[in-house]
Amino acid sequence: MEIEKSNNGGSNPSAGEEFKDMIKGVTKFLMMVIFLGTIMLWIMMPTLTYRTKWLPHLRIKFGTSTYFGATGTTLFMYMFPMMVVACLGCVYLHFKNRKSPHHIDRETKGGVWSKLRKPMLVKGPLGIVSVTEITFLAMFVALLLWCFITYLRNSFATITPKSAAAHDESLWQAKLESAALRLGLIGNICLAFLFLPVARGSSLLPAMGLTSESSIKYHIWLGHMVMALFTVHGLCYIIYWASMHEISQMIMWDTKGVSNLAGEIALAAGLVMWATTYPKIRRRFFEVFFYTHYLYIVFMLFFVLHVGISFSFIALPGFYIFLVDRFLRFLQSRENVRLLAARILPSDTMELTFSKNSKLVYSPTSIMFVNIPSISKLQWHPFTITSSSKLEPEKLSIVIKKEGKWSTKLHQRLSSSDQIDRLAVSVEGPYGPASADFLRHEALVMVCGGSGITPFISVIRDLIATSQKETCKIPKITLICAFKKSSEISMLDLVLPLSGLETELSSDINIKIEAFITRDNDAGDEAKAGKIKTLWFKPSLSDQSISSILGPNSWLWLGAILASSFLIFMIIIGIITRYYIYPIDHNTNKIYSLTSKTIIYILVISVSIMATCSAAMLWNKKKYGKVESKQVQNVDRPSPTSSPTSSWGYNSLREIESTPQESLVQRTNLHFGERPNLKKLLLDVEGSSVGVLVCGPKKMRQKVAEICSSGLAENLHFESISFSW
């Protein structure tokens, strides 16, 4: 009877699911309306209609208050709407995450949306870009061009030889100064979006179906635009001042208007960051790239001091959301987490297993940032989570490949003969998609190279857990993996967890693995004899299980933080302005120091964010701390020097009982000395909807994207997972 009920629920959504869909639809509609309204303001901003009709009316309505003064205009026009959108996004994601596992969102079923997500450009400076991404990029560039051309046309129309002579300028100098100003205005539009892709816990990205990792390329594009526009903006002003014999303007700090020196400091910080993003520098000297990016604090601080707080609110909403996310990550990273065990594979791969709060739920392909102070106190590195919160509710695992200096030091420490009782670790995350609707496909093909297999381990484990606990149909799984050496086959041992499975894989799981070893012609002695070393740690009682900093209802709490911190900010600023600034300045903006006013706003924003985030964290820690204390496991375990060898490469030499691992081995085909024929393997997969995921080298991702976009098979739906930034 229970099975019949579940099956009916899979095809006919319950009233509860329909209500959630309705709430999601309403919130997403409101988000879209408000966001499009903000875009409309940007479109109208350079026009004469906005300047002569809209702006005077808006200033009378919002800019004459004794509580906010002239700042109220941009505060309520740009800052307030985006905060509402972010809060609505939190509500949307809360209900989205509450859907049943067999319920498929209407927007993910396919059709036109699936075609728009197909790759359009495979090779080139932009990387692999879909039709949707190209469309939005073109629309954004069109917005920038529209604003710049309209600004110039309207400003140049007022510049005449007579007006230029009145300011002791030639015509070209007046036009150069006008163009320089407009370039800065266009840069502010790009800056408004710059920090949203790197706000890992933001509600805006997952509400649009994006993750922070997949959105890094948008941050890169926007970063290049911002720095290009601001650099030309600064150079034009330097040329203008030099031609006017006013080069001393470069060191001017006007406390009642624009501070040139502050702008130059901001630009210098931005140029240092921009220089380290050069691919060769970023890849060879990642630490330099990583550390110099902390100059964003200097960049934003002096940008606000340069233009003043009132104009900054046009570009500050994204940075405000980023600050909330950044401080929450800071609070989470202050605690050490409980590291239970480490496995070292023959392929120089390490699996770290942590204790996890059972209420922490994350989606497959999520990542987590890890810091190990004994190796480096400052470096944080992202790693893919390989475990499934459904299959292993109290454990979380990540896989680390020995490649750079940091991972090499970790491998040396874990491999040393000296016994390690404890390893202090701090984490940030997990971060990932709000949901992963793999069930919408009839078949799932995962193509990976080397350590690119790690995100797919979590996908497979999640589908296995779903097959054990739910009655929905599981897609056929094909894992195509390419390794350089036979010793790397041992990474397939990580596909299944050490515990949490039944005696055999469920018959509902139709999984096939095609493993290609490109440089070896057989398994080799190293792969046959390689031992898997396992270490068990004895964590300190002060170590915490990994948990969400805001508890199980994290999206609602994030919305509450955004709303309350912004409300507190407005209340405090309203009081300060009404009873301190207004009696001095009377809304003239000519008496009270603009620099002092800006610093007050920055301090109030910082205090509001820190206070609300800390209060929310302490509340959730107090509420769910008791649950976590009951999860403390007996960590006084032996530390064996090695465990059984890998299941691959020698299975024909031994007889073992039926286990999930052996069941997986039987479904694996090993191909030595050859590369996968991706075109044949992908086109041979049957099904009306085939999800194709790829994670690996750039050429592999491009090849798979080219096949999926070629039109040879309309049923292939491409998705790339890249961590090469």
UniProtKB/Swiss-Prot annotation:
Any one GO biological process: siderophore-dependent iron import into cell
Extracellular topological domain residue ranges: 49-74, 150-217, 317-338, 578-597
Keyword Ribonucleoprotein attached: no
Cofactor(s) annotated in UniProt: FAD
A GO molecular function held by the record: ferric-chelate reductase (NADH) activity
Transmembrane segments: 29-48, 75-93, 126-149, 218-241, 292-316, 339-359, 555-577, 598-619
Annotated residues for binding of FAD: 381-384
Catalytic activity: 2 a Fe(II)-siderophore + NAD(+) + H(+) = 2 a Fe(III)-siderophore + NADH
Cell location: Cell membrane
Free-text disruption phenotype from the record: Impaired growth on media with no added iron. No response to glycine betaine in chilling assays.
Membrane topology category: Multi-pass membrane protein
Misc: Post-transcriptionally regulated by iron. Coordinately regulated with the iron transport protein IRT1.
Primary role: Flavocytochrome that transfers electrons across the plasma membrane to reduce ferric iron chelates to form soluble ferrous iron in the rhizosphere. May be involved in the delivery of iron to developing pollen grains. Also acts as a copper-chelate reductase. Involved in glycine betaine-mediated chilling tolerance and reactive oxygen species accumulation.
Protein family membership: Belongs to the ferric reductase (FRE) family.
Record's comment describing the protein's domains: The C-terminus is probably located inside the membrane.
The name this protein goes by in its record: Ferric reduction oxidase 2
Organism annotation: Arabidopsis thaliana
